[in-house]
């Protein structure tokens, strides 16, 4: 199921008052330019719910954590930059809401400490592999870290939060899923500058490319198939194909009723025919119940064998082959 995540800041206090009008610090300028009222956040949250998505938010300060509670946010995200902001983390933990954390630029100790903190409080925690380079090049994605996180934190869901260039994002999400990531996060933007035809930020996807990204995820799920903890269910067409390659048992010479079959009496060859025993069922000492001419097939009904008494196996042998 999809979650739509918003970012919440108490902007007037999050940014020092002396820098409110700063134009040369991009992060501050962007934050000031995109400031929203609590009413606007409430409208966003309501729209998310109306579209049957999970409500999720990244609070960047303590007041914003309280806003998450007031807005009925279901899932809280801790940004990579805040993985050791313990004032904020303590406030988030008080909500008892499930948490996802991104690990971009974090030390192993930072991650271990955070995992232990939430484990000790029995608060569900998912851990995202993340590279905090905006935007990231393909060679910077380090998807093998998904393997590392899965091995180190086996009791937690591992995900993938990406900031790569918008073009060609399909392959990395497919690889991430194949490696075991099970939550996926990407920034979304809209082309409000119609003349440029580009997203505001190169690490964001516009709705059209996000659609490709989600479809790539679904294709990865289809390609990877069933869960990896148990043997897959073999489709009938695969079994039928392999049965056509299995060698059947044929008489090497004329054989009499009552003969005990030895390897000198038979040979193996394709095709395997319906009702015929194959190399899989051939056992030395099986007794013939009827005469078999040279080069003729030996069927399951022609021998006294444990296989002949297994009704389920009999049915398989009757139906397989040409």
Question: Language-model segments: which ranges?
Answer:
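Catalytic cores and adjacent flexible loops of soluble metabolic enzymes
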Residues: 1-322
